[in-house]
């Protein structure tokens, strides 16, 4: 419960900081469509909108706007909108998340045992393919399943999956465009990956 409350507090602080910004300038910087109280953007190929009044976030699903105020979504979106560097642009080459942070959080990304998603996709890789394609992904060479997904603006993120065998466990890996740190902070990349995993699981 304490951990959940800490997440809620941090998300509430992020919303308050966002609402204190010059949101017209934020909209201009990112080319966001404005509609009344709402600022519209696309994240992982999906339509989102953020309230100028209170920072609440919604995602469009089947023609309806649904609350999307999860911790990972909240921190990721506000970092992208408020802390992206001017003049940013993707470069089209790939790096691991650890490449951006000097191996600081290696233990968070390298598990000895396969997790639930890896086991799921090992049995049914079509679920991963379907989810990636629903998010606007384009197939890439390499790995047993490999896609580049639109993330934000021109930034993309790659999803790679290898089946397990007698020697190796199934493996799901994510790669960022090498310029990802122009769009979001290293720490926020972990929240973004949490969001991506949630959306893959929901769609596949």
Where are these predicted regions, by residue range?
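Charge-rich alpha-helical segments
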Residues: 1-12, 16, 36, 54, ...
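Short Lys/Arg-enriched alpha/beta "domain-start" segment
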Residues: 1-39, 43, 82-135
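Amphipathic, interaction-prone secondary-structure segments
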Residues: 27-53, 138-163
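Intrinsically disordered, low-complexity regulatory segments enriched in Ser/Thr/Pro
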Residues: 46-75, 162-187
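Generic alpha-helical structural element
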Residues: 66, 117-120, 148, 185
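Ampiphathic alpha-helical segments that act as solvent-exposed interaction surfaces
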Residues: 66-91, 177-204
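Domain-length accessory/inserted modules outside core catalytic folds
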Residues: 104-113, 117, 141-143, 181-184, ...
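Conserved binding-pocket/active-site segment within a compact domain
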Residues: 122-182
């Amino acid at each position: 419960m304490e951990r959940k409350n800490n997440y809620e507090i941090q998300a509430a602080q992020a919303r308050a900081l966002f609402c204190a910004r010059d949101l017209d300038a934020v909209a201009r910087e990112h080319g966001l469509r404005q509609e009344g109280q709402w600022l519209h953007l696309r994240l992982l190929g999906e339509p989102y909108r953020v309230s100028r009044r209170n920072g609440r976030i919604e995602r469009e699903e089947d023609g309806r706007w649904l609350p999307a105020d999860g911790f990972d979504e909240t921190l990721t979106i506000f970092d992208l909108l408020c802390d992206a560097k001017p003049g940013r642009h993707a470069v089209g080459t790939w790096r691991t998340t650890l490449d951006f942070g000097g191996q600081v959080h290696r233990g968070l990304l390298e598990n000895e045992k396969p997790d639930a998603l890896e086991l799921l996709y090992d049995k049914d890789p079509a679920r991963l393919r379907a989810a990636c394609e629903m998010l606007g992904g384009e197939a890439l060479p390499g790995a047993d399943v490999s896609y580049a997904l639109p993330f934000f603006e021109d930034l993309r993120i790659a999803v790679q999956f290898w089946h397990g065998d007698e020697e190796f466990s199934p493996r799901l890996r994510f790669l960022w465009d090498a310029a990802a740190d122009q769009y979001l902070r290293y720490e926020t990349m972990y929240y973004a990956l949490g969001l991506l995993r949630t959306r893959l699981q929901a769609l596949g």
